[in-house]
Swiss-Prot record:
Propeptide residue intervals: 33-45
Organism the protein comes from: Clostridium perfringens
Name of this chain's protein: Epsilon-toxin type B
Family: To epsilon-toxin type D.
Domain of life of the organism encoding this protein: Bacteria
Keyword flag Protein transport: no
Length: 328
């Protein structure tokens, strides 16, 4: 499961790149893609800030400081009134560009109690090995994912981004969303129908076998990063105080950080944190027990990708040719 999980993560991350590779693209598109990748790589090298509110407060502080510095030309002790002078914000155009959720490290996995799917007895009362068919089975199971924002990027800018948990053997994916501004928890669930066709089982002569199908459930937990680029400005007024005149102000978020921390487009990288916990069906197992010898053999029944249902909430499995214990 862990190897498949890591493989699934790699596949999920590479889907867009693979799509571009297998389709013929014009030289212009190739150049555009290379430029886009270069810009993305350059952004990832820049410093990342974890609280926009702090940057906004810094902008307001600098605004008041610069205002009183100008007033010192007329009132040498103007800076002594720093805590008395106020700022009244009147509007802003702050926004987060390209908010997205990225995996942060490898997830952990813990197998839970199996889900019973079905049971059948097959008896071969002849003197020769015989191929018998088990009955088909169907079961319903609810997959659930819970996502929590543990560290916001600040409450001043509202943004959300979706995240899909794709890594399980059934191919079922669960989608949830994260808030960049609120430490809230989202829980999404969906009922999945698992359809297991009859299996061809070769049974020894004069033998009864027990066939049990069950679904393994797994709890997958991990962490995520909430990333994006923030920009925008705030404007308002500084009310008059004593002899200090009223004044208007405006500052940009780009004014609150070192110029070396800015992306080429003047945006600032931000970084929040979150986690997720998904409980979902993983592998469909058929256990065949020879009741004469009590020997057991287990088989993983793969998903039938050729007969994939149009309904994403239905999983269809393949029919295998299985040798019961006692068959050489």
């Amino acid at each position: 499961m862990k190897k498949n999980l890591v493989k699934s993560l790699a596949i999920a991350s590479a889907v867009i790149s693979i799509y571009s590779i297998v389709n013929i693209v014009s030289p212009t598109n190739v150049i555009a893609k290379e430029i886009s990748n270069t810009v993305s790589n350059e952004m990832s090298k820049k410093a990342s800030y974890d609280n926009v509110d702090t940057l906004i407060e810094k902008g307001r502080y600098n605004t008041k400081y610069n205002y009183l510095k100008r007033m010192e030309k007329y009132y040498p002790n103007a800076m002594a009134y720093f805590d008395k002078v106020t700022i009244n914000p009147q509007g802003n155009d702050f926004y987060i560009n390209n908010p997205k959720v990225e995996l942060d490290g490898e997830p952990s996995m813990n197998y839970l109690e199996d889900v019973y799917v079905g049971k059948a007895l097959l008896t071969n009362d002849t003197q020769q090995e015989q191929k018998l068919k088990s009955q088909s089975f169907t079961c319903k199971n609810t997959d659930t994912v819970t996502a929590t924002t543990t560290h916001t990027v600040g409450t001043s800018i509202q943004a959300t981004a979706k995240f899909t948990v794709p890594f399980n053997e059934t191919g079922v994916s669960l989608t949830t969303s994260y808030s960049f501004a609120n430490t809230n928890t989202n829980t999404n669930s969906k009922e999945i129908t698992h359809n297991v066709p009859s299996q061809d089982i070769l049974v020894p002569a004069n033998t009864t076998v027990e066939v049990i199908a069950y679904l393994k459930k797994v709890n997958v937990k991990g962490n995520v990063k909430l990333v994006g680029q923030v920009s925008g400005s705030e404007w308002g007024e500084i009310p008059s105080y004593l002899a200090f005149p009223r004044d208007g102000y405006k500052f940009s978020l780009s004014d609150t950080v070192n110029k070396s921390d800015l992306n080429e487009d003047g945006t600032i990288n931000i970084n929040g944190k979150g986690n997720y916990s998904a409980v979902m069906g993983d592998e469909l197992i058929v256990k065949v027990r020879n009741l004469n010898t009590n020997n057991v053999q287990e088989y993983v029944i793969p998903v039938d990708k050729k007969e994939k249902s149009n309904d994403s909430n239905i999983v269809k499995y393949r029919s295998l040719y299985i040798k019961a214990p006692g068959i050489k």
